[in-house]
Amino acid sequence: MKNICVVTATRSEYGLLRWIIDILSKDKDVNLQIVATGSHLSKEFGMTYHFIEHDGYTIDAKIDMELHTEDLYSIPRSMGICAEKISYAFRSLKPDMIVILGDRYELLPIVNTALLFNIPIAHISGGDITEGAIDNEVRNAVTMMSSLHFPGTEESAVRLRRMLGMDENIYVVGEPGLDSFLRHQLMTRSELAEQLNLNASKQWMLVTLHSETKESLDYNLQMTENLYNVMIGQKNVQFVVTKANADFGGSQINKYWDAKQDDDVRVVASLGQLRYLSFMSQVECVLGNSSSGIVEAPFLGIPVVNIGNRQKGRHICKNVICCRSEERRVGKECRSRWS
């Protein structure tokens, strides 16, 4: 029996890993181990490790990075704390392989430690491109330290083959987030209205805006304000805003939204995967710069206004309109989508 350790650092990435975890948990030849770190252990970002436990899984190690995102100096400190603590966790758990997904900076101390411990790394969703964030560099660094690669598209696989200089151990598996639509029974509109205190007769919009980590804090706050200025005054529309990731600038964006919350602008730290996908299926439009607008929303055929450069370089489907972050541009594209 092999110890396969799945490491998760964010609410969104756990949602993508959920059904992979489920399959591993049922394999008689696998001893599943789960490590939760990053924003999962942060009060500011919703203590989302509870979603993992609610799904019936045991978390074998909780690595509190003492995560703070108010300034750039706090994040490297948190990464150093994570590296120290994860080394003790790996020494105790003795994983034969770790499984990680994506491009979050929280993964760097994980894969660095695994590399030093000579633990093979399986990386999901390598080979993608996101030009507007440091995620690109993180993703490629993780790729170079990994032994197994599971890209979502053939296009991404081509990039991996070019980067790695080999064809071996690269398997195109599709986008794991789409599995949830096949496995979940989505909630009804009336159930969502009751849980989120919304008016089911109004139009609903889903908003998720993360910081562009290659831009300044002022730029990111201006982008947020530009979107809010477009949202206010819309008649018969309610917006649900899910808070930004634990990137530099994320805390300030979240504080901005908290200050703007009212009956028609609902702000939540996290909806959880089932409510998030269910709500997405009921909205008139998805606004912001989340990867879910690029991957999951097209599966549902929901219109998307993708703002700014965070997702620049990704494959864009026909239902997605990309625009710059200026208020005039955002307003024009949003109104064209919900009119």
Located regions from the model:
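A generic structural motif
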Residues: 27-33, 58, 235-238
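Donor-nucleotide binding loops and adjacent catalytic segments primarily
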Residues: 52, 187-282
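Conserved nucleotide-sugar phosphate-binding/catalytic loop shared by glycosyltransferases and other
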Residues: 33-75, 85
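Conserved small/polar residues in nucleotide/adenosyl-binding loops
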Residues: 327-334
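A donor-sugar binding/catalytic signature common to diverse glycosyltransferases
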Residues: 100-101, 108, 123, 149, ...
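A nucleotide-sugar donor-handling region in carbohydrate enzymes
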Residues: 41-43, 145-220
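Short internal beta-strands
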Residues: 33-38, 149, 239-244
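Active-site and donor-binding regions of nucleotide-sugar-utilizing enzymes
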Residues: 5-8, 14-25, 65-167
